[in-house]
A protein has these predicted regions:
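N-terminal secretory signal peptides that target proteins for export/translocation
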Residues: 1-5
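Detector for the c-type heme attachment site
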Residues: 120-127, 151-152, 188-192, 235, ...
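Flexible coil segments in periplasmic/lumen-exposed cytochrome c-class electron-transfer proteins
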Residues: 22-116, 155-276, 311-352
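Intrinsically disordered, low-complexity segments enriched in Gly and acidic/Ser/Thr residues
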Residues: 269, 276, 284-290, 298, ...
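Bacterial N-terminal signal peptides
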Residues: 6-17
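Extended intrinsically disordered, low-complexity coil regions enriched in Ser, Thr, Gly, Ala
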Residues: 136-165, 196-198, 295-316
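Short cysteine/histidine-rich zinc-coordinating motifs and their immediately flanking basic loops
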Residues: 129-135, 289-295
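Extracellular-facing binding/remodeling surfaces
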Residues: 115, 124-130, 286, 315-316
């Protein structure tokens, strides 16, 4: 009987651990690209002020052997090997017609100082991926302020393992004023284009995380309960992970009912639980000349920022009251609604 009781207790503990992981009650580690919460004392690589952004502030990984195969993507005549596509100081530009001429700091970075090209992570078109930030269409002054906050330590990650946040801080310290201005003006000049498809579901594909925090589906694995999480992954995993496809976006699986719950919080404030997002970000959440748009952007990124602001690792006076009372479930709901909204950019002149 005692053995049976111990087995029942252990099974209950295991089930509780799964529920805790899926509820995000230890913090939304899934939004940071991790499969479980950080262990006590666990952190990313040391990144002191004098460090070179790369490789000192990045996780050490075994270089991928280049198979020499030239690959291509739909709608372009260009071809690159995987390592050419990922070259830190001149990554592949698949669609140069999609953006203005890139400043040198965006296209190539500064190799002597370990400053990788902005286009490596954020793409030449500024759309970025779930593990970093989409920067296209943000106000130039806002981008400049974020670089200043990274530099001063006012913007850090609430998950201490997130190495690319530390690398951004190191890059910000290395940038000249002219480089920071050029990068900000460049990304601000391009429209943000809707990048994520939001799907309400009670389950999500099982995923694995890359060293940089990109979620990829586990081939052949059954779906798993979504709990109170958002699981975001590339629409075309191989194109994104292998070739950095800047035209292929993401799909975000969110809990059933979360979009409607999020709409109530975003548009009314939820009876004092938060502040109406539309007050500052605009009725359509597409921002203003000075305030960033949040509609249709990466779900993982939005959750990270809400949680970072609440935990005080991203310091911002304007958002302090808005995030103070939010639970992780609230953040999931808000994000589900915000990420699902249409994008209307005054810079986007494409026919509709």
């Amino acid at each position: 009987m005692r053995a049976l009781l111990r087995a029942v207790i252990c099974a209950g503990c295991a089930a509780g651990a799964v529920v805790a992981a899926q509820s995000g009650q230890d913090g939304p580690h899934w939004a940071y690209g991790y499969m479980k919460p950080p262990a006590p004392g666990e952190s990313g690589p040391p990144c002191p002020p004098a460090a070179r952004p790369f490789p000192d502030c990045a996780y050490p990984v075994t270089p991928t052997a280049d198979d020499g195969i030239k690959r291509t993507l739909p709608g372009t005549t260009r071809s690159f090997t995987r390592n050419e596509a990922y070259f830190d100081y001149g990554p592949a530009d698949w669609y140069p017609e999609d953006h203005p001429a890139m400043p040198d700091i965006v296209a190539r970075g500064r190799q002597a100082d370990g400053v990788r090209a902005c286009a490596l992570c954020h793409y030449p078109n500024g759309q970025g991926k779930m593990e970093n930030g989409g920067v296209a269409g943000l106000p130039a002054a806002y981008i400049q302020q974020q670089l200043a906050d990274f530099k001063s330590g006012a913007r850090r990650s609430a998950d201490p393992r997130k190495a690319n946040t530390n690398e951004m801080a190191a890059i910000a310290r290395k940038l000249t004023d002219a480089e920071a201005t050029a990068a900000a003006d460049y990304f601000a000049s391009m429209p943000w284009r809707k990048w994520v498809r939001v799907v309400e579901s009670d389950s999500a594909p099982r995923v694995r995380a890359t060293s940089n925090g990109l979620f990829l589906p586990v081939a052949g694995a059954p779906a798993e309960p979504i709990g109170q999480r958002i699981i975001e992954m590339p629409e075309r995993p191989e194109s994104t992970e292998m070739m950095r496809d800047p035209r292929s976006g993401f799909v975000a699986y969110v809990p059933i009912g979360s979009i409607a719950k999020g709409e109530a919080l975003v548009t009314t404030g939820g009876d004092g639980r938060t502040v109406r997002c539309t007050t500052c970000h605009g009725a359509d959440l597409n921002g203003t000349a000075t305030i960033p748009g949040i509609a249709g952007r990466s779900a993982s990124y939005i959750v990270r920022q809400l949680y970072d602001m609440q935990q005080g690792t991203r310091q911002t006076k304007t958002m302090k009251a808005a995030v103070a009372k939010l639970t992780v479930e609230d953040m999931v709901n808000i994000t589900a609604y915000v990420a699902s909204r249409p994008v209307e950019s005054p810079l986007d002149t494409r026919p509709r």
